C-alpha cells in the first residue's frame, strides 16, 4: 500500500469537491476560511508511491519567484478565496536525497491549543496563517514525515534574491515575515532538515540588544548574520544556534504571532524564546519556537 502523500489539491466549491472525491482524494474537513465567511476552502490529498517532500505557502508575488525557479508546483487556488485577506497559495515539491524526507501525512489546525500538541508529537508546522490578513481563526497546515528529521542548518534572508538557491539546496522557508506589521524588508528564517541526529542543532536563541548579543557570543552560540528587524528602525535582532553535544537535538522550528499563541505553546511545555523579533518597532509580537527531541 502506498504510504506517501503524492498529490495535494484545493477545492473552492462543490464541483471541485465532487471531482476530487471521484479521483480518490481525501478531504481534510477544516474550512480554511473558518471565522471569516468567504468560500468554503478545503485541502485534499492522495497517497501514492512518489512522495511530496516539501510544502510552502506564498502571500505575495515576490515569494513565488524562487519557488518557480526551483521547480515547485503551484496549486493555483487562493486559500482566502471570497475573503478580504492576502492571496494565499500552496506549493509542493517532489525531491530526493538527504534533505527531502517524504511526507506521509498532512493536517490542518484552527487553534493554538491543538497546534502545541502537534508540535510536540513530530508534526511540522507551516508558519503562514492560511487566514493571513483576513482576521478569522488562526489556520495552519501541518505535515508529518515518514521518519524523524532534525534541524541541521538555519539561516535568514532580507531579500528574495537568493530564494531559489536556498530551495535548491534543500532549505525550507518559514513563510512568515519576521517584520510583520513593522514595515521594513521582508525577512524570512530558513531551515534545513536531515534524518541524521548527529548533524542536528542542539540549541536556538535570539538576541534583541547588544548585551544579549555579547552574552550569546560568550556562551559559544553562532549568529545568523541577517538582522531579523532589517529596515524597521527597531533593535538589531539575530537568531543564534549551537551545534555541539547533541543530547537533545532540535527537531522543529516555527514562528508564533501574538501573546495568546505563545501562552498555549508554553502551557504544553514547548520552548518559546521569549524575545520579540519586533523589539523596538510597532510590529506584531513574534517569537521563535522550537522543539528538542527528548530521547
Model-found features: residue ranges?
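Terminus-proximal functional modules
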Residues: 1-295
Amino acid at each position: 500500500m502506498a504510504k506517501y502523500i503524492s498529490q495535494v489539491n484545493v477545492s473552492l466549491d462543490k464541483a471541485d469537491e465532487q471531482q476530487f472525491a471521484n479521483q480518490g482524494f481525501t478531504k481534510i474537513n477544516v474550512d480554511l476560511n473558518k471565522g471569516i465567511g468567504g468560500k468554503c476552502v478545503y485541502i485534499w490529498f492522495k497517497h501514492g508511491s512518489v512522495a511530496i517532500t516539501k510544502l510552502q505557502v506564498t502571500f505575495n508575488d515576490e515569494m513565488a519567484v524562487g519557488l518557480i525557479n526551483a521547480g515547485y508546483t503551484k496549486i493555483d487556488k487562493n486559500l482566502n478565496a471570497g475573503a478580504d485577506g492576502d492571496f494565499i497559495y500552496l506549493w509542493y515539491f517532489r525531491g530526493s536525497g538527504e534533505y527531502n524526507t517524504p511526507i506521509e501525512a498532512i493536517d490542518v489546525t484552527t487553534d493554538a491549543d491543538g497546534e502545541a500538541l502537534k508540535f510536540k508529537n513530530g508534526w511540522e508546522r507551516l508558519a503562514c496563517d492560511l487566514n493571513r490578513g483576513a482576521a478569522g481563526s488562526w489556520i495552519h497546515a501541518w505535515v508529518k514525515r515518514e521518519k524523524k528529521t532534525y534541524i541541521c542548518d538555519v539561516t535568514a534572508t532580507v531579500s528574495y534574491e537568493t530564494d531559489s538557491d536556498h530551495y535548491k539546496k534543500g532549505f525550507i522557508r518559514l513563510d512568515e515575515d519576521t517584520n510583520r506589521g513593522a514595515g521594513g524588508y521582508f525577512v524570512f528564517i530558513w531551515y534545513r532538515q536531515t534524518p541524521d541526529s548527529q548533524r542536528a542543532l542542539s540549541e536556538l536563541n535570539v538576541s534583541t540588544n547588544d548585551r544579549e548579543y555579547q552574552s550569546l557570543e560568550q556562551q559559544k552560540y553562532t549568529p545568523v548574520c541577517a538582522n531579523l528587524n532589517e529596515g524597521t528602525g527597531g533593535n538589531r535582532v539575530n537568531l543564534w544556534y549551537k551545534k555541539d553535544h547533541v543530547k537533545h537535538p532540535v527537531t522543529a522550528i516555527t514562528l508564533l504571532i501574538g501573546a495568546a499563541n505563545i501562552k498555549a505553546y508554553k502551557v504544553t511545555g514547548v520552548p518559546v524564546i521569549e524575545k520579540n523579533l519586533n523589539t523596538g518597532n510597532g510590529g506584531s509580537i513574534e517569537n521563535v519556537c522550537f522543539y528538542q527531541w527528548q530521547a
